[in-house]
C-alpha cells in the first residue's frame, strides 16, 4: 500500500523518539477522491489507534491508515530527500484525488484516471487542467482544457507532444485525441 524509504523511516524514528512511548505515525487523506484531496502525516499516540485502522509495519516504525484513506493511498510513497538546499519530506499519492481503476474498467474510466492522476498534476503547475468530455465511436478522446491552458499558445504542443503521445501509448484502442476548447483570447480566457 505505502512505501516508506529507509531515509524517511530514519527521519520518523528520530522524531518519534521524542514522543510518548508507543507513538507511531498516521498517514491520511483529507477530502479523498476529490480535486481538493490533501495527504498528510501526523503522530499517532497509542490511544488514537482505531479498530478499523490498517497497521503497516516497517523496520523502524508502524504507520496507521484509516479505513476511508486506505484505497486512496494505494501506491503512495514517502521519502526524505537531502540536497544542497536542505532536507524535505515528500509524500506522493497518485490515487489521492481519484481511486485507481482496474485494468478491465471501461476505457472512459481508465483514460479519466490517467488524466487526473498523471497529466493534470503536471498541468496544475501552470494553473491548467484537462477534462475528458467523451470518447467517440471511432476511438477519438475529446478533451477540453481549462484554467491556465485556456488561451495558452503552447496548448497544441502540450496536446500533441505530451497528452496525445501518453494516451495513445497507454491505450492502443484510442485512435487520436481532439481538443474541443476555444483557445482564441477572449472573455473566457484564464489570463
UniProtKB/Swiss-Prot annotation:
- What does the note accompanying the cofactor annotation read? Binds 1 [4Fe-4S] cluster per subunit. The cluster is presumably bound at the interface of two monomers.
Picking any one GO molecular function of the record gives: 4 iron, 4 sulfur cluster binding
InterPro entries the record matches: Fe/S_biogenesis_protein_NfuA, FeS_biogenesis, FSCA_dom_sf, HesB-like_dom_sf, NIF_FeS_clus_asmbl_NifU_C
Gene Ontology BP annotations: iron-sulfur cluster assembly; protein maturation
Keywords of the record: 4Fe-4S, Iron, Iron-sulfur, Metal-binding
The cofactor required is: [4Fe-4S] cluster
Q: Which residues bind [4Fe-4S] cluster?
A: 149, 152
Pfam short name (any one)? NifU
Give the family this protein belongs to, as stated in its UniProt record: Belongs to the NfuA family.
The record describes its quaternary structure and partners as: Homodimer.
- Job description of the protein: Involved in iron-sulfur cluster biogenesis. Binds a 4Fe-4S cluster, can transfer this cluster to apoproteins, and thereby intervenes in the maturation of Fe/S proteins. Could also act as a scaffold/chaperone for damaged Fe/S proteins.
Q: Which NCBIfam families does UniProt cross-reference here?
A: PRK11190.1 (NF008392), YhgI_GntY (TIGR03341)
What is the protein name stated in its UniProt record?
A: Fe/S biogenesis protein NfuA
Amino acid at each position: 500500500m505505502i512505501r516508506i524509504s529507509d531515509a524517511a523511516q530514519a527521519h520518523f524514528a528520530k522524531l518519534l523518539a521524542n514522543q510518548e512511548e508507543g507513538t507511531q505515525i498516521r498517514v491520511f487523506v483529507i477530502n479523498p477522491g476529490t480535486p481538493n484531496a490533501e495527504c498528510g502525516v501526523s503522530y499517532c499516540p497509542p490511544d488514537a489507534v482505531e479498530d478499523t485502522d490498517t497497521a503497516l509495519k516497517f523496520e523502524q516504525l508502524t504507520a496507521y491508515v484509516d479505513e476511508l484513506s486506505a484505497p486512496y493511498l494505494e501506491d503512495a510513497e514517502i521519502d526524505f530527500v537531502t540536497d544542497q538546499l536542505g532536507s524535505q519530506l515528500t509524500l506522493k499519492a497518485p490515487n489521492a484525488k481519484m481511486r485507481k481503476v482496474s485494468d478491465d474498467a471501461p476505457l472512459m474510466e481508465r483514460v479519466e484516471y490517467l488524466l487526473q492522476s498523471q497529466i493534470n498534476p503536471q498541468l496544475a503547475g501552470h494553473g491548467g487542467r484537462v477534462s475528458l468530455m467523451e470518447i467517440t465511436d471511432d476511438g477519438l478522446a475529446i478533451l477540453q482544457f481549462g484554467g491556465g491552458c485556456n488561451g495558452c499558445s503552447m496548448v497544441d504542443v502540450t496536446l500533441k507532444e505530451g497528452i496525445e503521445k501518453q494516451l495513445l501509448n497507454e491505450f492502443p484502442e484510442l485512435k487520436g485525441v481532439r481538443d474541443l476548447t476555444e483557445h482564441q483570447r477572449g472573455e473566457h480566457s484564464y489570463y
